[in-house]
């Protein structure tokens, strides 16, 4: 990965280089990598949309397959930015990330423009949903659930507009020795085995521990705080054995799992890269909208090598 001139490397004094300092820096490292990769093909302060994600899309790990994602990496170093969005009769969310992987806002079906600003910046006139960031650079990530209406979703993209957001995109990233990186990554991999996804992401610095945040970022970068999204990760079967690609499993989704206006999704990923798994049927997830529930309100989802079975993936 070539990070180009947008990445400023800062050597660390030996006394400062510790496993803990690496763990605290890791979310920033990953955000900068993702930002600079995106900026190689896109303009700061503008939107790029994925369409329906398939296994070839490696922009973000653990994506949802029946969602049209919109990405906009921006900088408010030179002043606030104003974001306007379309009106949508299904699920639409706007998540705002800073470079520390804080998520200061997740706004579902916005009803007014969103103002992105630093705490020291003056408020412009107008009625806004105000979001303050801890860093100049950040990401707006939009999600529009697709329910056999991709054409309408695509047509609404032009209504996502950002005024401003074209400031300085340089972001410092600290360097570490290979030994420190190896030791710190081993710590992250250990934390991943027991981290509660509900505790992995916060709105401001200090909401979650630096250990949980580092593990959360490695497990699923651009994850969202638990008051908006609840994550559940299943890596083993009911005997404790790792899930296998040549086996068949049945997952039961409980009734009453989500609030009015929300929905559930179950997605299958490869354990090696956390991306969607290629399959002939091109079915990568099951959601409230693409599953047939049971009479008791639960939903049975079948995971198998050929996608057979009720609500199969």
PLM regions: where:
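Cleavable N-terminal signal peptides
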Residues: 2-3, 13
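N-terminal signal peptide c-region/cleavage motif recognized by signal peptidases
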Residues: 9-11
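A compositional/structural signature for long, glycine/proline-rich flexible linkers
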Residues: 15-313
């Amino acid at each position: 990965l070539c990070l180009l001139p947008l990445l400023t490397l800062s050597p660390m004094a030996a006394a400062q280089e510790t496993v803990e300092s690496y763990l605290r820096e890791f979310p920033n490292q990953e955000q900068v990598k993702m930002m600079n990769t995106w900026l190689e093909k896109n303009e700061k302060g503008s939107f790029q949309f994925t369409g329906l994600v398939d296994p070839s899309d490696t922009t973000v790990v653990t994506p949802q397959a029946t969602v049209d994602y919109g990405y906009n990496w921006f900088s408010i170093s030179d002043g606030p930015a104003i974001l306007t969005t379309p009106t949508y009769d299904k699920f639409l969310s706007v998540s705002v990330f800073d470079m520390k992987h804080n998520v200061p806002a997740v706004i579902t079906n916005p009803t007014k423009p969103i103002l992105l600003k630093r705490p020291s910046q003056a408020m412009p006139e107008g009625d806004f949903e105000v979001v303050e960031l801890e860093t100049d650079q950040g990401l707006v990530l939009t999600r529009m659930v697709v329910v056999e209406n991709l054409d309408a979703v695509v047509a609404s993209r032009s209504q996502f507009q950002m005024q401003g957001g074209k400031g300085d995109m340089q972001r410092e990233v600290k360097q570490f020795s290979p030994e420190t990186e190896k030791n710190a990554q081993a710590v992250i991999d250990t934390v991943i085995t027991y981290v509660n996804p509900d505790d992995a992401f916060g709105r401001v610095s200090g909401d979650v521990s630096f250990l949980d945040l580092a593990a959360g970022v490695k497990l699923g970068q651009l994850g969202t705080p638990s008051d908006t999204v609840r994550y559940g990760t299943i890596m083993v079967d009911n005997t404790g054995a790792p899930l296998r690609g040549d086996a068949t499993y049945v997952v039961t989704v409980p009734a009453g799992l989500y609030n009015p206006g929300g929905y559930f999704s179950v997605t299958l990923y490869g354990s090696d890269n956390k991306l969607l798994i290629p399959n002939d049927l091109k079915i990568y997830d099951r959601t409230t909208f693409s599953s047939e529930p049971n009479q008791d309100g639960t939903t049975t989802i079948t995971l198998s090598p050929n996608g057979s079975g009720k609500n199969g993936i």
